[in-house]
Amino acid sequence: MSGRSTFGRFGPPSSEPWERKPGDDEGGPKRPKVERPDTNDLLKRMRRVDPNQSRRYRQRTGE
């Protein structure tokens, strides 16, 4: 034997590859907590830029 461990240079695998924070019950990426834009405000801004585009958007989304 060459004196190396069976795990190589990385060491033994840990049971959990990351540290859990207290209160972190769910795994995976989190969705940022931001408020949704007001659709009326969005349509007003679209109307200023291109009136036809705001009309098409309203038809497509059912507004």
Swiss-Prot record:
Keywords: Isopeptide bond, Ubl conjugation pathway. The keyword Thylakoid does not apply. There is a cross-link at residue 63 (Isoglutamyl lysine isopeptide (Glu-Lys) (interchain with K-? in acceptor proteins)). GO terms for molecular function: protein tag activity. Transmembrane segments: none annotated. Residues 1-63 are annotated as: Disordered. Residues 17-50 have a biased composition (Basic and acidic residues). The keyword Lipid biosynthesis does not apply. Pfam families: UBact (PF20513). May function as a protein modifier covalently attached to lysine residues of substrate proteins. This may serve to target the modified proteins for degradation by proteasomes. Belongs to the ubiquitin-like protein UBact family. This is Prokaryotic ubiquitin-like protein UBact.
